[in-house]
Structures are given as structure tokens and as C-alpha cells.
Amino acid sequence: NGDISAWDVSNVTRMGEMFSGATSFNQDLSNWDVSNVTDMRGMFLGATAFNGDISAWDVSRVTDMSYIFFNAESFNQDIGGWDVSNVVDSSSFDSGALNWQDDYKPNFQ
């Protein structure tokens, strides 16, 4: 795995399934500017080793977070501060994320 922490993703709008099935992926994405992303569907689906701090991400434009952490077994970061007010699909958002504490999850209205 090459270092992708400095990638410029500021113009990306769709990150759906970006790391889907990447079972050994656990890189630092904390500095990524995802403020233009609208689709994060299945982004970390099956990324069983991922537990990166993405709490500072601006996800306020995201509308689809379905399956984003589906079977992301190691994920246990506090993203409770995420603005998910524009999310219209959060189905199976965290199914199978076995180690994730409920109070770390965003509050979908």
C-alpha cells in the first residue's frame, strides 16, 4: 500500500466503494478534503482493518452513506460530530461494524 494521505481529492464527488473489500487497508485519510463528496456509498465496505481517524471530515454535502461501514469490523472512531443532515440513504450504514461504539456514530434524523 502506497501512502495516499496527501492525495488531493478536493474535487472528487463520488467515493462510493472506494476501499470496498480492501481488507488490509488502514491508512491515514485524516487530511483529505471530502467537502465536495456527495456519494460515500460502501466506501469502507468490508475494509476490515480500517480504523483511521476521519472525524474532521466535512461530509455535509453527502447524500448517500448506505453501507459505508458495512463489515468494517475494526472501525471504532468517533464521528458523532459529522453533519449528516443532507444524507437521504443511510441504510446498513454500520451493519457488521462489530467494534464500533454506538455513542461514536452520527445521529441520522
Regions found by a protein language model. Give the residues of each.
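Negatively charged
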Residues: 1-109
